[in-house]
């Protein structure tokens, strides 16, 4: 079973990432306190710990996952080619809208990181909120192939 390991938000572009132990998630604004939450297909971004570690192994570097600037870190999950599937985290349901493409900003964190994140969805997935609620570090995470529509 996959677990939510970490939650990060930022209140503006290029702002420092801020750790949260728990956060409210809504259809209107994504993660409370995160400025990207109003983007229709990219309200929440998710990275898998093992994918992040694979990228770092290729680089031979040790870089904190917060350098990815994604919102959620989960473990024991394969997000590759999961567009349209749903992630269930606690009571929250997210629909995966696509792969998160690693941006040039990754090179600022570590030379070569952008290319190391490119294969196999290592940079993570972008999601939209289907069902809001509260999530907290330690919540179980489940990937399902169902197709759901936002209800709020």
Regions inferred by a protein language model and the residue ranges of each:
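Metal-cofactor-dependent catalytic cores
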Residues: 1-152
């Amino acid at each position: 079973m996959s677990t939510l390991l970490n939650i990060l938000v930022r209140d503006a572009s290029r702002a420092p990432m801020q750790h949260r132990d728990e956060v409210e998630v809504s259809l209107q604004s994504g993660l409370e306190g995160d400025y990207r939450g109003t983007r229709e297909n990219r309200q929440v971004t998710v990275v898998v710990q093992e994918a992040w570690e694979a990228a770092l192994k290729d680089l031979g570097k040790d870089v904190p996952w917060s350098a990815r600037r994604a919102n959620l870190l989960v473990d024991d999950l394969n997000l590759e080619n999961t567009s349209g599937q749903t992630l269930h985290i606690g009571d929250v349901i997210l629909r995966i809208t696509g792969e998160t493409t690693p941006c040039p900003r990754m090179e600022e964190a570590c030379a070569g990181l952008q290319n190391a994140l490119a294969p196999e969805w290592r940079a993570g997935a972008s999601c939209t909120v289907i069902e809001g609620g509260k999530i907290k570090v330690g919540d179980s995470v489940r990937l399902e192939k169902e197709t759901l529509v936002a209800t709020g």
